[in-house]
Design a protein with these regions (language model features):
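Bacterial Sec-dependent N-terminal signal peptides
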Residues: 1-22
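Subset of outer-membrane beta-barrel
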Residues: 19-279
Length: 279
């Protein structure tokens, strides 16, 4: 019992220290799930079967799509407990050029609704609508019958700066790319069912920082991350399948350094602390 209590204490202490070093990035809307399947599976998608929304999690899956082409459109209300006009919309199209390759394109738009600005209660409000968007293009190629890779390019535009009449309110923009891979085994016969293995990886949002206000000192990392996953399909017949999938995600941006607060000390004992005694 003492060992268990000690382990819990260590984990709690580590968690408390980690919360003091919160990692923040620009354009976090890139990590919001746009489709119902991924959202319902805790943002998993790098090693699931191919669908029209594979662009966000692993475009290499398009090379294994059973459909020659596909189109998807989604609308996701976001943070509805805070506001009723924050939402994410996405449109995606993919096309299998041949048996080995496919390309896809998508547009993702994140709107933060209308915000009223006024200097005082009596002023006539001025309405602004901050928003962010990303345009993606990807190409997938089968390197073998069971493995494919893909590369995706992404243009990102963030228009969050609220003009105040004294500073530049131009939108910030940057670019990023993804490198992804997907493995899918041949369907194998077991005693009571057929089965198939899946695995995937994706290095996402690799690119330079995003710069706001045209100021080189006011920059933010974009949410670069690594996704790894694997799974197995229990295939009972043409219409019934159960999939077991597991994935891990690692954010690839620096963790803020620990800050040490030095308490001032009255070294000479005179009851006051001057600047020379503050480190």
């Amino acid at each position: 019992m003492k060992k268990i209590a000690l382990i819990i204490l260590i984990i709690t202490t580590f968690k408390t220290q980690a919360q003091d070093r919160v990692i923040t990035t620009g354009v976090p809307f890139l990590l919001i799930a746009a489709d119902a399947r991924s959202a319902g599976m805790a943002d998993m998608g790098v090693a699931t079967s191919a669908d029209a929304y594979s662009q966000q999690y692993n475009p290499a899956k398009y090379a294994f799509s059973l459909n020659g082409q596909g189109f998807s459109m989604s609308y996701t209300p976001y943070l509805t407990d805070i506001a009723n006009d924050i939402s994410l919309g996405q449109v995606t199209y993919f096309n299998r050029i041949n048996e080995r390759s496919a390309f896809a394109g998508s547009l993702r738009y994140f709107g933060l609704g209308d915000i009223e600005l006024r200097q005082s209660f009596e002023d006539t409000p001025r309405t602004v609508s901050p928003n962010e968007l990303a345009i993606d293009v990807s190409y997938a190629l089968k390197l073998s019958e069971q493995f494919s890779m893909a590369i995706a390019g992404r243009f990102i535009r963030s228009n969050l700066k609220i003009p105040d009449g004294t500073s530049d309110a131009s939108a910030a923009s940057t670019f990023a790319f993804d490198v992804a891979g997907f493995y899918q085994s041949e369907e194998e016969a077991y005693s009571d069912f057929n089965g198939r293995w899946r695995a995937g990886f994706n290095l996402q949002n690799l690119g330079p920082k995003i710069k706001y206000d045209n100021d080189v000192t006011n920059t933010n990392f974009i949410p670069s991350n690594l996704r790894l996953g694997g799974g197995f399909d229990f295939i009972f017949d043409e219409y019934n399948k159960v999939s077991v999938t597991g994935e891990v995600t690692k954010l690839l941006v620096p963790t803020p350094p620990e800050r040490t607060i030095v308490e001032p000390v009255d070294s000479n004992g005179d009851g006051t602390i001057d600047n020379s005694e503050v480190n």
